[in-house]
Amino acid sequence: MNYPHPLIAREGWPFLAGAFVISLLVHASAGFWWALPLWIITVFVLQFFRDPPRPIPSQPNAVLAPADGRIVVVEKTQDPYAGREALKISVFMNVFNVHSNRVSVDGAVEKVEYFPGKFVNADMDKASVENERNAVLIRRAADGQLVTLVQVAGLVARRILCYTKVGDNLSRGQRYGFIRFGSRVDVYLPLDARPRVTIGEKVSASSTILAELDVK
């Protein structure tokens, strides 16, 4: 299992360093009990920015979860980024989930598009169309089918980070982005994709199979 990233995401290093230094200074000057709430915050920051490696299923037609969290949508609807009817599966991440975003399928990036917007609760349906978001369209290497991944900012999460660009060749399980402090990822698939998850189910990034694609 090759995951060439630190166990604590680089995006969190400044936050962790700041929390640790402040906790240490208060501890040294005022004692443990005064510093205890700050140490608790430091531990929270540490767990929030964890970024562990995950096993990746070998099933070639599997679409993998792009994020840790809970399934809040499984429905057929319009994919506004690709202009098609699609199967939509949405993963909601709360503040206790890992917030590293990982690629669902092998393929080439056809389009990356950022949309400014609001910051309503990412658990709500309207977050998909009203909130700040970033869409990545991937053309599957195996059969040319299109998969759309959309990072959606949430009520607390106000910073979407995406590290891929048009023309990049991506692999399943590859880290491609990060969203801080609670958010959501929408996945749009071909209409004939077969969902393997249900609403309310907890999923793990790059380990849980969201759906299976028909091999063309």
Curated annotation (Swiss-Prot):
Binds 1 pyruvoyl group covalently per subunit. GO terms for biological process: phosphatidylethanolamine biosynthetic process. Pathway: Phospholipid metabolism; phosphatidylethanolamine biosynthesis; phosphatidylethanolamine from CDP-diacylglycerol: step 2/2. It is a peripheral membrane protein. The modification Pyruvic acid (Ser) is found at S183. The active site is at S183 (schiff-base intermediate with substrate). It is found in: Cell membrane. Keywords: Cell membrane, Decarboxylase, Lipid biosynthesis, Lipid metabolism, Lyase, Membrane, Phospholipid biosynthesis, Phospholipid metabolism, Pyruvate, Zymogen. It catalyses: a 1,2-diacyl-sn-glycero-3-phospho-L-serine + H(+) = a 1,2-diacyl-sn-glycero-3-phosphoethanolamine + CO2. GO terms for molecular function: phosphatidylserine decarboxylase activity. Disulfide bonds: none annotated. InterPro entries: PS_Dcarbxylase, PSD-A. Its cofactor is pyruvate. One of its GO terms (cellular component) is plasma membrane. Its EC number is 4.1.1.65. The record marks G182, S183 as: Cleavage (non-hydrolytic). PANTHER family: ARCHAETIDYLSERINE DECARBOXYLASE PROENZYME-RELATED. NCBIfam families: AS_decarb, PRK05305.1-2, PRK05305.1-5. Catalyzes the formation of phosphatidylethanolamine (PtdEtn) from phosphatidylserine (PtdSer). Belongs to the phosphatidylserine decarboxylase family. PSD-A subfamily. This is Phosphatidylserine decarboxylase proenzyme. It comes from Cupriavidus necator (strain ATCC 17699 / DSM 428 / KCTC 22496 / NCIMB 10442 / H16 / Stanier 337) (Ralstonia eutropha).
